[in-house]
């Protein structure tokens, strides 16, 4: 949820029926309000943050994530993650934007060194706060090098199009929320079920071994060779590499 329509009734329903919720907040007030404004241009931060804090506390700081998207406009995204922690959140995620290269906020290849340094900066502060008793969980640092998911999960990755679907407010079914609006990936509707089974079958075969450039990648069983949406946007087929 983006939090705009979140109220006590919705919180109560989610706490009763949903084991995990994702609360969309892009970080600091200026960052969030630039990317998540209302139609009149005003920002959403002041409205949604108190609701998210109440929601997280109602779950005893478990079974939720505050999740943001960083863009070229905030390559200092570690400050946004730490802002979550300063607001009292303990479960958080921050992911790079998926955008057409023509967009001014799209991440470019020359940004990668700065992004890698920022993850290092975040990791150092993450460890520091953990030692100080102010720790938090950052989803993308939760990587178990000795155990982790089963081999089938490592091969298949996120499971989009087969293990889960995105449902729009109009009931349309897509392999994942990032595909919503792309008609070539419309799988059906909640009333009709999955009608376009060819899409499901394509995603069913989308795994590490189906990706031609991924079979020699040393970390392929940790990233499952990347995101199908990114592959479709930038490399062609959903089983391409990105």
Task: State each model region's role.
Residues 1-97:
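Radical SAM/AdoMet-radical enzyme domain recognition
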Residues 9, 47-50, 79, 114-117, ...:
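Generic recognition of stable, solvent-exposed alpha-helical segments in well-folded globular domains
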Residues 103-182:
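A C-terminal junction/extension of Radical SAM enzymes
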Residues 181-242:
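Flexible mid-to-C-terminal extensions adjoining Fe-S/redox cofactors in radical SAM and related proteins
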């Amino acid at each position: 949820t983006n939090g705009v329509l979140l109220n006590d009734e919705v919180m109560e329903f989610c706490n009763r029926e949903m084991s995990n919720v994702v609360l969309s907040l892009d970080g600091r007030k200026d960052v969030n309000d630039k990317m998540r404004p209302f139609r009149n241009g005003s920002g959403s931060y002041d409205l949604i943050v108190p609701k998210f804090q109440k929601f997280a506390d109602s779950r005893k700081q478990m079974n939720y994530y505050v999740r943001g998207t960083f863009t070229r406009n905030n390559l200092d995204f570690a400050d946004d993650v730490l802002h979550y922690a300063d607001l009292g959140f303990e479960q958080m995620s921050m992911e790079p934007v998926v955008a057409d290269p023509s967009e001014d906020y799209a991440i470019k290849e020359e940004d990668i060194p700065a992004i890698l340094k920022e993850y290092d900066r975040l990791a150092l502060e993450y460890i520091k706060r953990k030692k100080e008793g102010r720790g938090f969980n950052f989803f993308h640092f939760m990587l178990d090098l000795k155990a982790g998911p089963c081999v089938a999960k490592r091969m298949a990755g996120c499971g989009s199009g087969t293990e889960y679907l995105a449902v729009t407010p109009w009931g349309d079914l897509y392999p994942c929320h990032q595909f919503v609006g792309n008609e070539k990936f419309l799988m059906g509707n909640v009333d009709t079920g999955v009608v376009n089974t060819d899409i499901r079958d394509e995603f069913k075969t989308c795994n590490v071994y189906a990706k031609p450039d991924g079979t020699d990648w040393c970390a392929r069983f940790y990233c499952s060779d990347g995101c199908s949406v990114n592959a479709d946007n930038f490399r062609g087929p959903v089983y391409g590499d990105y």
